[in-house]
Each structure stands twice: as C-alpha cells, then as structure tokens.
Amino acid sequence: MNQNQLISVEDIVFRYRKDAERRALDGVSLQVYEGEWLAIVGHNGSGKSTLARALNGLILPESGDIEVAGIQLTEESVWEVRKKIGMVFQNPDNQFVGTTVRDDVAFGLENNGVPREEMIERVDWAVKQVNMQDFLDQEPHHLSGGQKQRVAIAGVIAARPDIIILDEATSMLDPIGREEVLETVRHLKEQGMATVISITHDLNEAAKADRIIVMNGGKKYAEGPPEEIFKLNKELVRIGLDLPFSFQLSQLLRENGLALEENHLTQEGLVKELWTLQSKM
C-alpha cells in the first residue's frame, strides 16, 4: 500500500450544539493514505458519520485541524477540498437528478463546466468502470438498489476525485446489491482510481478493507488491519458491533475441534479452507 498521506486529522472536536456537554467528535486524530481502503466502523451515535461529514467540510470542527491533499480545511477552502472528495450516501433514490443514467452521471461535469467532448468520454469511462454501460438510457427508477448505487459511484468517479467516501452506502441494499457495490469498490481500488473511505456499522463490509478504525462515543476506540481488529472479539460486541458471520462460524468450528488455521474474515476464505480440509479426509 502506498504510504503517501492524503488526509490528516488532528485532535478535532465537534458538538451539534455549542452548549451541549456531549461531543459528537471528541479529540479524534487519524491519517488516510493514498490508494488504501479505510473502513470507519461503529454503532449508531459512535461519531463515524459525523467524521465523514467533517472530512468533506459539510460540518467544520470547533477545534483541531483537517488537511486534505495538502489543503487546510477552512470555510474559505471548503469548495476546493470538495473537489478532492466524492461522497456516496445511504439512500440511492435521494442522489438522482438526471432523467437517465447518462444525464445523471454527466450532471456534476456540466455544473463544473467540463467541455462536451470530454464530458462524453468521462461518462462513458465511468459507467464502464462500474459495469453499467448497458444502462445509459435507462430511467433511474427502473434500476435495482445496487445498480443505483453503482450509478452514484460512476457520477462520483467521473469527476475524478482523489477520495471516495461511502457513507453507509450499502446499508439499504439487499445482499446482492451490497455485493455489487463492494465488488465495484474493490475494482476501483485495485485499478488505483481512488482512495476509499467506507463508513459502516457492518463488519462484514469492513473485513474487505485494508485498515479499520473503530469509533465509540465520539472517540477513536481502535485502529488496525482487519485481522488485528477482529481479535478484539467480545470488546467489539460490547460496543454494539456484530462480528462477521464467517468469523463467528470459524470460532465455533475451532472450538468444536475442527483444525482451521484461522478465524476467517470472509466467507470465501472459510469455504476455501473447508474444501481443502475435506480433500485431505
């Protein structure tokens, strides 16, 4: 993984009301590196979505510093920072402004004054990256939830941001739609097209990331690669998170005498080892 620092957050504090005792963000510091997939996880009210909004300048912290791609985030620089970051939100139906997929992906480019020929090239390129090139003339309401989110991602990457933030972008999708979106994210990351930050309460999704930050009570609770974070096990359950099914099943099988090499973070890894064990019997 590239270790060029893309985002630096230093000791930020945020309250939704200035007179509130509770801090939605309470002294949070973190770094995001170019080319990585970072998952920020936590239960409802942990501060993870507030942090996403702070990174994009939708809210400004009352103290502390945020720097994005070398730009200090302030009221004056917020629009410059937003050119570096694209966001995909929770409800795909709230994100469409065009009457067709083509119009929707082109909308942000038109607003930014991109020349028509370049805009056509960017739209065609973006929809191919998310495998939606066969739906360019479809009306958005005819698409499935997963397809809608893939179109939303196409609209983001057409603008060529350095960073994509997925704010609970899979939480309203069925399992098929969720997997479609996560496969799209994996493809974008592997092709080096963007740094990805996914905000989620779903540890099955977070297990696919390079690194996880766990939020709790507005503070950073833990940080590390997925295999290290899941060793916290009961601590994660205690703060309101559900361990991935594959991890729980791996634990149960090992406790009952099956010689698995590890507690698997993904179903694919668990199935692969079970097949290997079966072939040796």
Swiss-Prot record:
ATP binds at G42, H43, N44, G45, S46, G47, K48, S49. It comes from the Bacteria. GO terms for molecular function: ATP binding; ATP hydrolysis activity; ATPase-coupled transmembrane transporter activity. It is found in: Cell membrane. GO terms for cellular component: ATP-binding cassette (ABC) transporter complex. Its main location: membrane. It is a peripheral membrane protein. InterPro entries: AAA+_ATPase, ABC_transporter-like_ATP-bd, ABC_transporter-like_CS, ABC_transpr_CbiO/EcfA_su, ECF_ABC_transporter_ATP-bd, EcfA_1, P-loop_NTPase. Keywords: ATP-binding, Cell membrane, Membrane, Nucleotide-binding, Translocase, Transport. Its EC number is 7.-.-.-. The active site is at E168 (proton acceptor). The keyword Membrane applies. Residues 7-242 form the ABC transporter domain. It holds the Pfam family ABC_tran. The keyword Metal-binding does not apply. Transmembrane segments: none annotated. It is an enzyme of class 7 (translocase). ATP-binding (A) component of a common energy-coupling factor (ECF) ABC-transporter complex. Unlike classic ABC transporters this ECF transporter provides the energy necessary to transport a number of different substrates. Forms a stable energy-coupling factor (ECF) transporter complex composed of 2 membrane-embedded substrate-binding proteins (S component), 2 ATP-binding proteins (A component) and 2 transmembrane proteins (T component). Belongs to the ABC transporter superfamily. Energy-coupling factor EcfA family. This is Energy-coupling factor transporter ATP-binding protein EcfA1. It comes from Bacillus subtilis (strain 168). The gene is ecfA.
